[in-house]
């Protein structure tokens, strides 16, 4: 990728804390991955960033799962997309609590 895409997959006014680096990182991860992307989010602060239903701040499908289930969920989703011959990106994205604290 030589240029940053203009498309936004995180809408303005998320529920993130002011100056949250995790939401900024996720913004650019999604720009790199593109619109054909599914997020798997374990219980962590990232599930707060997305907002409260029905007012989500994400423009991609999101699956919230338990801490220990994120990798298995993403693996199963990737296999299902592969069997359907789809090249959908499946990304597990977690905040610091979902990554190293638990």
Where are these regions (language model features)?
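Cofactor-binding active-site loop characterized by glycine-rich and histidine/acidic residues
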Residues: 1-102
């Amino acid at each position: 990728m030589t240029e940053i895409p203009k498309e936004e997959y995180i809408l303005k006014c998320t529920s993130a804390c002011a100056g949250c680096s995790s939401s900024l990182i996720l913004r650019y991860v999604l720009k790199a991955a593109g619109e054909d992307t599914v997020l798997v989010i374990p219980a962590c602060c990232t599930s707060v960033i997305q907002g409260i239903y029905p007012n989500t701040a994400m423009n991609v499908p999101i699956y919230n799962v338990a801490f220990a289930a994120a990798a298995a969920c993403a693996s199963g989703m990737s296999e299902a997309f592969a069997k359907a011959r789809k090249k959908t990106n499946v990304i597990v994205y977690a905040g610091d609590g979902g990554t190293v604290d638990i």
